[in-house]
Amino acid sequence: MSVPIFRTVKELRAAVADWRRDGLRVGVVPTMGALHEGHLSLVRAALANTDRVIVTLFVNPKQFNNAGDLAAYPRTEKEDAAKLAPLGAHMLYAPDGAEMYPNGFSTTVSVSGVSEGLCGAFRPGHFDGVATVVTKLLLQTGADLAFFGEKDFQQLHVVRRLTRDLDIPTQIIACPTVREADGLALSSRNVRLSADDRRNAPKLAEALFAAAGRLAEGTPVAEVLPNARDAILAAGYQEVEYLELRGEDDLAPLSGLDRPARLLVAAWIGGVRLIDNLPVAQPA
């Protein structure tokens, strides 16, 4: 059985209104397509916690600050729909650019604080694009719950902040990062890795897990992070954009483990930018 594909806000809202009349809870999983097991785990979580699940598919041009990255982003709607069908998702909402940003569109949602630093420092305008499209998707779907992966941890904080600040009643549900057997965090960008780079790519997670372990043992942050950065570069990565310890709850920079923390990294390998993060246990 195929998943119904909706293209317009009008169609979407009519379907959701029918569900509401039946007293059904609605979940949404926002994606840019090129679905992998990480996305599908979000869909399964949504199906387990709501009555009707909308998966959105929109490659959002406003969150790309590099035209080449936007052009190279995989677009696989037919394959995505085929992956969703056996799971039982109730709708694939796949608007085009004109539907999402009609002529004259002139509003940007900008979340300060948690959007600054980390990815925000290297991708100017990215989180404005994320915040704008997510705000629209939450308002369009009227979902009770929205499901996001922890792999995009800064994005998760941005989305939580905008729902609080704008009084959007959708509850944001964080789901664990899904990894390949070799540890590499799943990403739609992984398909762009060459065979050699794919072999080396898991060393990013390896360095992250090793660093998190050393921090949990009490090794000073000022010693652990430079060593981890060196290990990533030695593994075949060309650049480490950032490798930082931040507060789990507010993304504030940390110099020690005096509260729940998260280790976050972004690095380039073979022209592909990969991100990852891990929670760090406090020393016993």
Swiss-Prot record:
Q: Is Iron-sulfur one of the keywords?
A: no
Q: Which Gene3D superfamilies match?
A: HUPs (3.40.50.620), Pantoate-beta-alanine ligase, C-terminal domain (3.30.1300.10)
Disulphide bridges in this chain?
A: none
Q: Where does ATP bind?
A: 32-39, 149-152, 178, 186-189
Q: Which domain of life is it from?
A: Bacteria
GO cellular component term of the entry, any: cytosol
Keyword Cytoplasm assigned: yes
One biological process term from GO is:
pantothenate biosynthetic process
EC id: 6.3.2.1
Q: Spell out the Pfam families in the cross-references.
A: Pantoate_ligase
Q: Which UniProt keywords apply?
A: ATP-binding, Cytoplasm, Ligase, Nucleotide-binding, Pantothenate biosynthesis
> Which InterPro entries does the record associate with it?
Pantoate_ligase, Pantoate_ligase_C, Rossmann-like_a/b/a_fold
Pathway recorded for this protein: Cofactor biosynthesis; (R)-pantothenate biosynthesis; (R)-pantothenate from (R)-pantoate and beta-alanine: step 1/1
Q: Where in the cell is it found?
A: Cytoplasm
Q: State any further remark.
A: The reaction proceeds by a bi uni uni bi ping pong mechanism.
**What does this protein's UniProt record list under function?**
Catalyzes the condensation of pantoate with beta-alanine in an ATP-dependent reaction via a pantoyl-adenylate intermediate.
Question: What family does this belong to?
Answer: Belongs to the pantothenate synthetase family.
Would you tell me the protein name for this molecule? Pantothenate synthetase
Question: Which gene codes for it?
Answer: panC
